[in-house]
Amino acid sequence: MKSILFILLSVFMAMAFNLQAQNDTLNNYDEKNRKHGTWVKKYSDGQVRYKAEFDHGKPVGTTKRYHENGNLKAVMDFQSSGRVFTELYNKDGDKQAEGFYHERKKDSVWTFYDENGRIVAKDSYTKGKRDGKSLKFFRNGDTSNIVPWTDGKRDGKIRQFFDNGKEKLIGYYSNGKLKGPLTIFYPSGFKKVEGRYKSNLREGKWVYYDEEGDTSKVINYIDGKPENEEQLEREETKEIRELENNQGKFDDPRNMLYERNRRNQRRR
């Protein structure tokens, strides 16, 4: 009887140690119970979740994280300066973004890629907040959108372009609000709309042009309200709607990449 119990206990302990080995491999602590040396964590099926190096509780060297399908998810290079250069990948193994973290916040320039490795956007950060120019690009690499940021708020001259290189829109932000002149163009280069904003509201005379460059309509605004509502309904443009509807929204390139990946998954 004792022999049987001993055998069962041995088998149980072996299974327990095997399970531990699958999920926590080479995981060590120093005398103060801080992570130290090589650490490997695994998913329940034994697939590696991440590999990392620690020096008395502090991550050092290169950390690699993996998706459950085994493809690379992230590579993090911990530098002596305290900054961490990071590369992020989707489940198919395509690089989606790269840039620096400092104190767990995005810092300096981050670059975002599509599934074919083309750059789709670049953002500048300071201590986790957008600070500097935010750029978007067409598939051919030409710039499609320029938005300046200061301390996490849109601030300065914004520009949009057609894929032929001509300007599509010029406007201005001040401390996160639309302020000053706005001009929208046709692909031909002729003006389409001309007006002004004051604290996010349309103000004064707004002029609408036809594709030949002739004035088609003039609407006067007071505190964001047109004198003639029917004229507004007819002359509303897609560019103006997008500009005003995006107020207060944080346009993160990762959202655009996520939607693209989801569409690609549906096609398969």
What is each stretch, according to the model?
Residues 1-26:
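Bacterial Sec-dependent N-terminal signal peptides
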Residues 17-268:
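Glycine/tyrosine- and acidic-biased, solvent-exposed loop/turn segments at the edges of beta-strands
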